[in-house]
Amino acid sequence: NAPIDIFYGIPSSVPSTDERLETTGGIIDCGAMKHLLKEEDVVCVGEIMNYRQIIQENDLEITKFLRYLQEEHPGYVIEGHCPSLLDLDLARFLYLGIDGDHTEHTLEEVKQRIENGMFFEIQDKMLKPEVLEYICENRLYEYCGFVTDDTMADVLYEKGQLNYVVQKAIETGFPVEMAIYCATYTPSRRMHLYDRGTIAPGKLADFLLLKDPAVIRPDYVYKNGVQIFAQKNG
């Protein structure tokens, strides 16, 4: 009964390394992925990590599943993990339908991803001034969103999670309104969660109230229109 919605991605890289390198507790093959696709709370294919292998081989379990998606579920959300891929290799990766990436990149790598239609997910280590400046100067807000990845419990407790990333982006020069936009609206659209991400008639009443929009420290939090948090000194 926790006041939070949890969605899942289909594990696409289990095991994440070659069986010749390490043993694994199990294998999620194409059949298992098809089964998971039927689950109500599954909204995407989780990050595909064997990016070098997948653009060279077509008999992998995940490659079979991607072909199935292209035939039976075109447009399904497929998340990638492709640090350093550029040019033709990046095109091969995108050709498989993998059009999201959250890993760390140089500015040139960011440009190529956005120019080729990939949704770029910005985590803490990608809050580089030159990257944020490029996005702002070219008004590329629709093509990116703020995310977190592998947040440890102590970091979550001490710094927060997405609120910390948004705050840091603002302090690095990202416009306040667009920082909030890229943490709410664009991620919702990316995951096809069209019932949220904006305050509008007919949408879920999930929102927070801030005393100062430039200080991402929630004073009040509402879930489905019900207040679930209030600062003690608020």
Residue ranges and their predicted role:
Residues I6, V45, R113, D149, ...:
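Divalent metal-coordination and catalytic microenvironments
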Residues Y157-G173, E177-G234:
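Active-site microenvironment of metallo-dependent hydrolases
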Residues I6-I10, V43-E47, I78-G80, G100-H102, ...:
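Hydrophobic faces of well-ordered beta-strands that scaffold small-molecule active sites
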Residues H102-T103, E121-L127, Y141-G160, G202:
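Short acidic/histidine-rich active-site segments
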Residues E47-H105, D124:
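Divalent metal-binding pocket/active-site signature
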Residues N1-G75:
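Divalent-metal coordination cores built from histidine and acidic residues
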Residues D41-V42, H73, R92-G100, I114-F120, ...:
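Glycine-enriched alpha-helix->loop->beta-strand junction motifs that scaffold or abut catalytic
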Residues E57, D87-L94, P129-Y141, M152-Q167, ...:
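Histidine/acidic-residue-rich catalytic or RNA/ligand-binding cores of hydrolases
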